[in-house]
Amino acid sequence: MVAGEGFTYAAAGVDIAAGNRAVELMKEHVRRTFRPGVLGDLGGFGGLFALEAGRYRQPVLVAGTDGVGTKLKIAFSLDRHDTIGIDAVAMCVNDILVQGAEPLFFLDYLAVGKMVPERVARIVAGVAEGCRRAGCALIGGETAEMPGFYREDEYDLAGFAVGVVEREELLDGSRIRPGQVVLGLASSGLHSNGFSLARRVLLVEAGYTLERKLPELGRTLGEELLEPTRIYVASILPLLKEGLIKGLAHITGGGLIENPPRILPPGCSLRLDRRSWPVPPAFRLIQATGRVPEEEMYRTFNMGLGMLVVVEESDAGRVKSRLEAAGEKVFVVGEVIPGRREVEFVPGLQ
């Protein structure tokens, strides 16, 4: 569209008015996440958060960033956008939690092919819900309209979380030693990893539709795949503050093979008993349908465990009970053994 003799930004595909409308629609969702420390309101060039210095002796800020990956393709196909923001928050806050940090605030980055205010508001409402579950404030973000870069019905979503921990309470692997017990917290499904493989196997090779109800899942494939990533902050944080947790591993890309070694000190390995927790049907479906090797499954997916928790043997019972009381499904899945920073599975992977 031409205004007078020149082109407008709207003619190039960027609708500033629609962007402003999206901001108005999301404001109340965002404000409901505010916690003590938040300064100002929406609309500033930067989000503001005041750290209460008197509460800490040597505070360390812990930052994490992540995206949702190709799980977004499922949201596009189903035109369901209200929970994908929870995934963006979960991937970030669970990561900083494993360092011992309490999440303080979050920022999101949303890039869209076409600014549809109602859709953007639904996405951000999901981000706000994730922040509420994690106890952190959504203090800012960016929504960029990028015509010609993304299709009109597509977008990308990423986030950035910042938390705080006392320097002496940082979880850096130094508290882990042989003889400690490993607890596994159940995942809610695939979380936000392995979707390129899952989509290839289930949607392309098997030809399933997202609307198809599969008996082994007890719901539609789309509902299973869109299940939000579980956020573990509320259940784990009190135990961290009491010093009962010696190590945490967020099971994301790399699965149970590559993530646990990231937290292990030299001289330690994990032995995990694969018979000690139930593998959800979705993973068995992917493995059987795609003839995916067992080792590939354990390197790609969480296989039913979203977080590993390392505790002293003497504390294992009460930590398990506390986590269960907080709503987690908890399994005693293994132990720390002498080794070379790797995971040993019993029985071994085929």
Curated annotation (Swiss-Prot):
It is an enzyme of class 6 (ligase). CDD domains: PurM. One of its GO terms (cellular component) is cytosol. Coiled coil: none annotated. The keyword Ligase applies. Pfam families: AIRS, AIRS_C. The keyword Cytoplasm applies. GO terms for molecular function: ATP binding; phosphoribosylamine-glycine ligase activity; phosphoribosylformylglycinamidine cyclo-ligase activity. Disulfide bonds: none annotated. Its EC number is 6.3.3.1. Its main location: cytoplasm. Pathway: Purine metabolism; IMP biosynthesis via de novo pathway; 5-amino-1-(5-phospho-D-ribosyl)imidazole from N(2)-formyl-N(1)-(5-phospho-D-ribosyl)glycinamide: step 2/2. It is found in: Cytoplasm. This is Phosphoribosylformylglycinamidine cyclo-ligase. It comes from Moorella thermoacetica (strain ATCC 39073 / JCM 9320). The gene is purM.
